[in-house]
């Protein structure tokens, strides 16, 4: 009997996914090569990536809505850096709701001014901050939608006129959700999608 894993990760995969992957590792689509033997620049691998990106957008309800999905290395923690590196020109706002948002704030400060608009640190992150002002001149607002360590989750997403960015590593694909509220979001694969080592990034 297959074990269940109720921790934050790694994700338990459906049997049909394991079976399809094991077949592809032996030989991919009758091409005479294993999935792990083909070039990452080959047409076969390009097709795999394009299908994965397209299916991700479809599952997220973002197909045909002006979003692009990409898979990157480095885990979600790398996105703490890359988000600020690419988007932070003047100043950004962050909501501090736990361990991962604390780390995101620390990394973003390497690239510019970071405003911690609200925090639940005063009560050991046991609630999601509410009732804060969001300046209109921010480059973006960053939130972490779910906090596995402290057991808190956004039930409503902040309404804002500035671009909204989210770390959704631990609750992406977990519930019906209007992902179009976000201008960019990212998630490490190992919690809800598959093996560790890759991050899904979706950007408008």
Question: Which residues does each predicted region cover?
Answer:
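Gly/Ser/Thr-rich loops at beta-strand to alpha-helix junctions
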Residues: 11-13, 74-78, 98-101, 148, ...
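PLP-dependent aminotransferase-like
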Residues: 76-141
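Conserved N-terminal alpha-helix of the aminotransferase class I/II PLP-enzyme fold
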Residues: 31-82, 99, 107
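General beta-strand structural signal in soluble alpha/beta enzymes
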Residues: 5-7, 69-73, 94, 116-118, ...
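N-terminal "arm"/small-domain region of PLP-dependent enzymes with the aminotransferase-like
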Residues: 1-39
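Active-site phosphate-binding strand-loop segment of PLP-dependent enzymes
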Residues: 9, 108, 120-172, 184
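Active-site PLP attachment segment
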Residues: 181-204
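Solvent-exposed alpha-helices and their adjacent loops that cap or buttress functional pockets
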Residues: 61-65, 87, 132-136, 156-159, ...
């Amino acid at each position: 009997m297959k074990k269940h894993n109720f921790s934050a990760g790694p994700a338990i995969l459906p049997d049909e996914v394991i079976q399809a992957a094991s077949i592809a590792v032996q030989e991919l689509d009758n091409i005479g090569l294993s999935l792990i033997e083909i070039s990452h620049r080959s047409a076969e691998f390009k097709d795999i990536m394009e299908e994965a990106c397209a299916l991700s957008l479809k599952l997220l309800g973002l197909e045909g809505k002006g979003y692009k999905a990409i898979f990157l290395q480095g885990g979600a923690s790398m996105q703490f850096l890359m988000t600020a590196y690419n988007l932070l020109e003047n100043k950004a706002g962050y909501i501090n709701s736990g361990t991962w948002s604390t780390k995101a704030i620390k990394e973003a400060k390497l690239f510019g001014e970071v405003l911690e608009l609200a925090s639940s640190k005063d009560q050991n992150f046991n609630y999601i901050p509410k009732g804060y002002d969001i300046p209109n001149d921010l480059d973006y607002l960053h939130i972490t939608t779910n906090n596995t360590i402290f057991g808190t989750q956004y039930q409503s997403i902040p309404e804002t006129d500035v671009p909204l960015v989210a770390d959704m590593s631990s609750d992406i694909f977990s519930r019906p959700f209007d992902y179009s509220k976000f201008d960019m979001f990212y998630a490490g694969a190992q919690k809800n999608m598959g093996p560790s080592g890759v991050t899904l990034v979706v950007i408008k």
